Amino acid sequence: GNTAFKWGIHDGYQWLQKGIASYECLTSIKNDFRKLLNPSAIIISHVSRAITKQQINQLISIWPTEVYWVVSQSAQCGVFNSYQNAAQLGSDRWASLIAAWSNVHEACLVINVGTAMTVDALSDSGKFMGGIILPGVNLMRHTLSLGTQLSDPILVGAYKNLPTNTNDAIYSGVIYGLIGSIERFYNLFSLELGRPIIRCIISGGDAPVLIPFMKLPIIHVDHLVL
């Protein structure tokens, strides 16, 4: 991901172990990885900086296993890619679309809320119809603090329907913006299909921040890509 490294061990039936670490701590978990059995396959989705890819390569070099780096395809695992340049679609979004399709096999929204928020549309035939990318909760707040001349430091506010202080106004504005974007995308995609979408899969570290404000038919999956 953009800010964290997530990993999991799967035996073909279930997840045996999962973990998460900041990129600053990748070196320190190498000893933990040495205690694991040699994996028969290593599959990686990487959307961060080139230097983090080097760190990941060093981390997994303890195993002789061949590594598969996920790259978006024109079609894969029953999902068809409508991006003008298929390879330009982020591997995390592509993996999420494949995971969502394997779960529901029908039209749905795929929402990931992390450093950035993505909202993607899957049709009944498994076709990725398109999607949007926005700053996530914290990035939107941080960007606002950098781009404005507020006299006081921005603190974490609370959501209010009608905020009466700056911190609450900023936090509430972020929620308004992200929820409003999801709902607009949901409505437009439902019109495109000719019926309401009955499943919206949501994942990502900040999904719990938005879920209380969502009035859509959501399915929360903690780690959709994994």
Question: Where are the model-predicted features located?
Answer:
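Short loop/helix-cap segments at secondary-structure boundaries that form the rim of catalytic
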Residues: 9, 60, 77-80, 209-216
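Adenine-nucleotide phosphate-binding core of ATP-dependent small-molecule kinases
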Residues: 158-199, 206, 217-218
